[in-house]
């Protein structure tokens, strides 16, 4: 795969990665999840692939609820037997990709933009997307006193989580569709893009330093709880209202060395999604309980309930939409047209799905040949 002159945000990644790396420095690349009760090894269980542990990364977001629920309900641990689940929580994609590249994690739940970036920067050698997890859960929430219609967004200050992340690309693309000009790197133009960590965004909104935000759940619902109004649900911009927000990646080195362990994690993911979709209220509570275990703070009902309703949990990686998101990044000037052929390896996922009697999924022409 050829080297791209301008890989996804080569300038921005170093900057936006700095904050999460600082906050996680005490724990390496990701903070460790305190999930002792949910990672207990059953008596008589055997190790998979001779591994002592499998290191799993994810974000403390509801869009990563497959991982949250899988850990909280002990589903990952059940499938891995005596191989211990070792969870790590991240705040941003670049730090999770760095952790995957260094071997600090083996498998991760992550958004499409950092997946693309990690693959492109490594010339297609670092990772594979091996499954889907979630669709939706992204909204443009605004101050209704300042913004009453979509056209009012022009001239305002809108937050996105970080330069070049999935929501940043989506907002820049939407702004371009309105014929507004914005410098992608600086965020300045007909609308000002303010890159703000999701943890800080609600306070920035309350202080008036931003007029709205294009953000994932639960941040979007936190803003609504502060008086914000949902002006646009990103799902409305996509065919069938479906687009990838979270997929599953694995280190290519780990995939080659330990396919049985990867298959076990994928089986657990499929089981978790099945349980989530069959038991939405219980699943919502389980995800919130894991968020509390990881961060020390659970979400309030007025945030949790609306946030949960806007997310769809699926094993389908929605590969065609990832390709479209890459095209949006190219359009925004954040990425030269990449060669994503081979970014997916859905072999093990489809093996699991067939065994479970479920429909297989495809890579939209971007799979391993």
For each of these PLM feature ranges, what is it?
Residues 22-26:
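C-terminal motif of bacterial Sec signal peptides marking the signal peptidase cleavage site
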Residues 36-194, 211-214:
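Short, glycine-/small- and polar/acidic-enriched structural segments
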Residues 28-31:
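Bacterial signal peptide processing site
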Residues 77-82, 183-186, 236-240, 308-318:
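Short, solvent-exposed loop/beta-turn-alpha elements that line the ligand-binding surface or hinge
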């Amino acid at each position: 795969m050829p080297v791209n002159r301008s890989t996804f945000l080569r300038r921005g990644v170093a900057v936006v990665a700095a904050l999460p790396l600082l906050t996680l420095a005490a724990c390496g690349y990701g903070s460790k999840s305190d999930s002792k009760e949910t990672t207990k090894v059953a008596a008589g269980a055997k190790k998979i692939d001779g591994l002592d542990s499998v290191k799993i990364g994810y974000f403390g977001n509801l869009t990563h609820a497959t991982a949250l629920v899988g850990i909280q309900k002990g589903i990952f641990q059940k499938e891995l037997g005596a191989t211990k689940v070792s969870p790590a929580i991240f705040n941003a994609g670049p730090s999770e990709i760095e952790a995957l590249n260094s071997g600090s994690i083996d498998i991760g739940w992550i958004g499409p933009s950092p997946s693309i970036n990690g693959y492109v920067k490594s010339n297609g050698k670092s990772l594979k997307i091996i499954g889907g997890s979630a669709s939706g859960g992204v909204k443009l929430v605004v101050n209704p006193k300042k913004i009453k219609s979509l056209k009012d967004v022009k001239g305002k200050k809108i937050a996105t989580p970080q330069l070049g992340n999935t929501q940043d690309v989506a907002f820049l693309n939407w702004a371009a569709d309105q014929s507004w000009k914005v410098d992608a790197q600086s965020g300045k133009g007909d609308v000002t893009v303010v890159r703000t960590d999701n943890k800080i965004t609600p306070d920035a909104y309350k202080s008036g330093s931003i007029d709205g935000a294009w953000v994932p759940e639960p941040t979007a619902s936190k803003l609504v709880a502060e008086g914000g109004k949902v002006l646009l649900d990103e799902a409305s911009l996509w065919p069938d209202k479906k687009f990838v927000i979270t997929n599953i990646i694995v280190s290519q080195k780990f995939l080659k060395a330990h396919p049985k362990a990867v298959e076990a994690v994928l089986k657990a993911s499929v089981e978790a999604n099945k349980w989530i979709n069959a038991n939405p209220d219980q699943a919502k509570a389980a995800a919130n309980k894991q968020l509390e275990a990881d961060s020390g703070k659970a979400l309030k009902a007025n945030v949790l309930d609306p946030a949960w309703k806007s997310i769809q949990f699926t094993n389908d990686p929605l590969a065609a939409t990832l390709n479209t998101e890459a095209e949006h990044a190219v359009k925004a000037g954040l990425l030269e047209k990449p060669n994503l052929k081979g970014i997916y390896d859905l072999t093990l996922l489809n093996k699991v799905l067939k065994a479970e009697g479920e429909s297989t999924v495809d890579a939209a022409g971007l799979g391993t040949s």
